[in-house]
Amino acid sequence: MDIKDILARCDHTLLRTDCTAAEIRALCDDAIRFGCASVCIPPAHVAGAKRYVNGRMKICTVIGFPNGYNTTAAKVFETEDAVKNGADEIDMVINLGMVKDKCWDILLDEIVRIKAACGGKLLKVIIECCLLTDEEKIKLCEIVSASGAEYIKTSTGFGGGGATREDVALFKANVAPHVKIKAAGGIANLQDAEDFLKLGADRLGTSRIVKAAKAMEKGE
């Protein structure tokens, strides 16, 4: 698989707590240069990044991140604010406590409400696989498939574990055909990226593929 094809499916990501505006601009420059799908950045940086890229790159941001236990009303407000500020894509975190309590109807309602708040923008639902049983993951595949969201996503990258090949395969076997898959967290190199894409991932959340592309340019 050509590295350009992999880069085109990467959300070039910087979600570190103390990231600066200068770092976000550099992230955007790299994403534009290497033809990434989007930059995934904190909500507070969306408006500035939108002005900076000036239509040259899609802006993705996160909602209820990273713990997911904000109220639904708070997540809806966050989503509306992000869209107003120029976000093209929204990655939301579900309430994992409600998963453990099997509050399936509440979880579905939350995703539906956030999708409505997206105003037509793309929605990815982060379920934090490292904290779930396979049975819970399968149930969430069903819920996301019914919600109107476009993507199911493996991980925040902050939950103690990232994407695994097993989880991407499980998603592929259990989501509806219209739901795409984003693998995120722990994608360390080009081989990881290629493996996830071959297993059925449509998008990758990582910064390391751009780093790999830079290293290749230098002949490293």
Report each predicted region and the residues it spans.
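Alpha/beta catalytic cores of nucleotide-metabolism and tRNA/nucleoside-modifying enzymes
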Residues: M1-D29, R113, L170-K180, I187-E220
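Structural motif
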Residues: F34, N85, A117-C118, I143, ...
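Glycine-rich phosphate-binding active-site loops on the catalytic face of alpha/beta enzymes
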Residues: T61, F65, K84-V99, A146-G162, ...
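Glycine-rich, proline-tolerant flexible connector loops at the mouths of alpha/beta enzymes
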Residues: C28-G48, I63-N70, I90-L108, S155-A163
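Active-site mouth loops of central-metabolism enzymes
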Residues: D5-A21, C60-V76, G97-C103, K124-E136, ...
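Conserved anion-binding
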Residues: T79, E89-E150
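Alpha-helix-loop-beta-strand connector modules within alpha/beta enzyme cores
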Residues: P43, A47-N67, K102-C129, G162-N189
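Catalytic cores of alpha/beta
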Residues: K50, N70-D81, L132-I143, E166, ...
